[in-house]
């Protein structure tokens, strides 16, 4: 059991429960590159560790509910594939913005940030910024993705922007629920001149 039924996607009410080993087995049956497979597994392990701590149990006893559903596995695997295809060397995430208040999950009403998000951001030293927006802006899956790929918190002094992408969440808030990512190339002598970089800004993931 976990808090992942607050995931921003719409799911049916019935999902099977899968352990980490079962999810690993599903990922291994796909035709992913070695790097994409490792990243997908890393994201799920971060989630499992956070849920294990939240429930005071061992990681082997964690069974995913919503995050174990096929569509959520596809979400994480798709991210891993796209990330691998971009050949990104460094990821800059200064912090992520979170909402306030409470949410309802299978365990009842719990405060925002939910325990799994707190555990991930604490374990990986990810800075959270509070907003006045009522609701959950950061899901455990989103926090796990940031934890899995972030390498730095501050941009290089000199860089050029190659591409910019936006992803909009389905929930309606006072401010746009948008994730922005920039693919940049560093002009710093300390980094490979041809290194592709990504910089994540806003968050509703």
Residue ranges of each PLM-predicted region?
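Short glycine-rich or small-residue beta-strand-to-loop segments that form or flank ligand, phosphate
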Residues: 63-68, 200-204
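Mobile "lid/hinge" segments at catalytic clefts and subdomain interfaces of large enzymes
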Residues: 88-204
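Short, hydrophobic/aliphatic alpha-helical segments
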Residues: 48-62, 87, 91, 127
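Glycine-rich nucleotide/cofactor/substrate-binding loop typically near the N-terminus or early
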Residues: 1-54, 114, 123-126, 133-134, ...
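Conserved phosphate/anionic-ligand binding catalytic regions in large, soluble enzymes, centered on
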Residues: 64-87
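Short acidic, glycine/Ser/Thr-rich loop/turn "cap" segments at secondary-structure junctions
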Residues: 27-34, 59-67
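ATP-dependent carbohydrate kinase catalytic cores
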Residues: 52, 72, 95
């Amino acid at each position: 059991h976990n808090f992942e039924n607050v995931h921003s996607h719409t799911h049916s009410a019935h999902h099977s429960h899968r352990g980490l080993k079962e999810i690993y087995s599903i990922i291994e049956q796909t035709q992913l590159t070695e790097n994409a497979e490792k990243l997908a597994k890393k994201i799920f392990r971060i989630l499992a560790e956070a849920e294990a701590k939240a429930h005071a149990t061992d990681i082997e006893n964690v069974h995913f509910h919503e995050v174990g559903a096929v569509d959520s596995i596809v979400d994480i695997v798709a991210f891993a594939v796209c990330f691998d295809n971009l050949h990104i060397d460094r990821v800059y995430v200064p912090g992520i913005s979170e909402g306030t208040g409470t949410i309802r999950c299978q365990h009842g009403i719990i405060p925002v940030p939910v325990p799994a998000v707190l555990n991930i951001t604490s374990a990986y030293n990810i800075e959270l910024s509070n907003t006045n927006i009522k609701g959950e802006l950061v899901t455990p899956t989103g926090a796990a993705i940031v934890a899995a790929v972030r390498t730095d918190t501050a941009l290089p002094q000199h860089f050029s922007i190659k591409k910019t992408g936006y992803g909009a969440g389905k929930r309606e808030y006072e401010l746009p629920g948008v994730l922005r990512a920039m693919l940049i190339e560093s002009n710093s002598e300390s980094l490979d001149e041809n290194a592709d970089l990504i910089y994540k800004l806003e968050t509703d993931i």
